[in-house]
Amino acid sequence: MRYPSGIGSGVGERVVESGEVVAAGVDALADAGGMAMGATEPPRGKPPPAMRAIPTASSTTPADTVSERGMRLFSDADRMPSERASTAVRRTRAAAKLRERGFGALLVSPGADLFYLAGYQVFASERLTCLVLDPDAKATIVCPELEAPRVAVAAPDIARRTWGETEDPYVAVASLVRTAGSIAVADQMWAAFVLKLQAALPDRSFTVASEITRELRMRKDAVEVEALRLVSESADRAYRGILERPFAGRTEREIGADLGELLRAEGHDEVGFTIVASGANGASPHHETSDRRVAEGDTVVLDFGGAMRGYRSDITRTVHVSPTAGHEEQKVHDVVRRAQEAGYAAARKGATAESIDAAARRVIDEAGYGEFFIHRTGHGIGLDGHEHPYLVRGNRETLEPGMAFSIEPGIYLPGRFGVRIEDIAVIDADGSVRPLNRADHAFATVA
């Protein structure tokens, strides 16, 4: 449910020399393997205490390696589809939008937009890295000289303009957009970079790049939908695995560390977040996992996710620590489950984003818990954990094939407990909605 934002790949038969301009047509692109990736370490908590034998995590993917804790060590990332041809097609579409809207250039800094258009992932730093795209789909990556080898591997079909430590990268960018009167800039580009670009390009107008990239990224292509399916299946397996772990007597942080370990063992190359909210902590949707010890009788909200080759997972289930749940806990869980089902029933091609929120909210309102549903029903997901479309009142955007989003109603009773259920879903080509998460929605009991 909550996110910080990867994959990296490129296309080409040879490495492009620094400064060489390449006009890579879509027809010339060939499939190729290999991706440049970045990953962050999972949250580090206290190591879990010695535990009983842990069943092997279930999987449909063969594995040759098993960890000392009995978990399969494999990666669905090994069978993720190639992104290389897709990035060139996306640049062509972005260039068409530049022409339609009268922009002379698109400047994209490190982040999801850079990966989406170039297949290159690098973390933002004080050294400027910038993709420059013109209305004819001519692309150049301006990058520090020391990063040029990485760019060559990740995006060999894109020209490079490198700069040394004593050179001014803003002059290099300016030289590529001399004729551009209006420039679209990446939404998340650092303000310090934007100000220096404005100084290097006086008398130009600047606008945010979401006018170009938002519409493209909302509608996932087949490669992206498959990536989201695989990463969601990986998260499902992690959930099934955590149900076999002990809860009572252990801290939220220890259980969160288990979730991170399971996500990696089941194929994730990045752990984004592991919310473990037990007892009264469950009434805070974005609870910071703590050292509170889980007790018998607690209801526990588990909201976790990460990335596999850049594409994000996000799943929430609520469990109960005892053989049987209390009457109200079970009642609230049933209401939330019915609310999610109503959201699914409303989701289809042509439906407005707010109509899914209204459908889920109506169930909770009618059950008498309306004031305790305190957030929107869902958010888009892809290369970012939260992106358009947002399923919230007032958003009249219509759902279209390729749009992927969460459906995650919740009820939060202050000082007592909370319940949330979340899946990722996608609108298919035939206009129907398809869940990408398949893990059981039952109010599971754990030891």
What are these model-derived regions, one by one?
Residues 3, 37-39, 53, 73, ...:
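N-terminal leader/targeting segments
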Residues 69-447:
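Active-site neighborhoods and metal-handling regions in enzymes and metal-associated proteins
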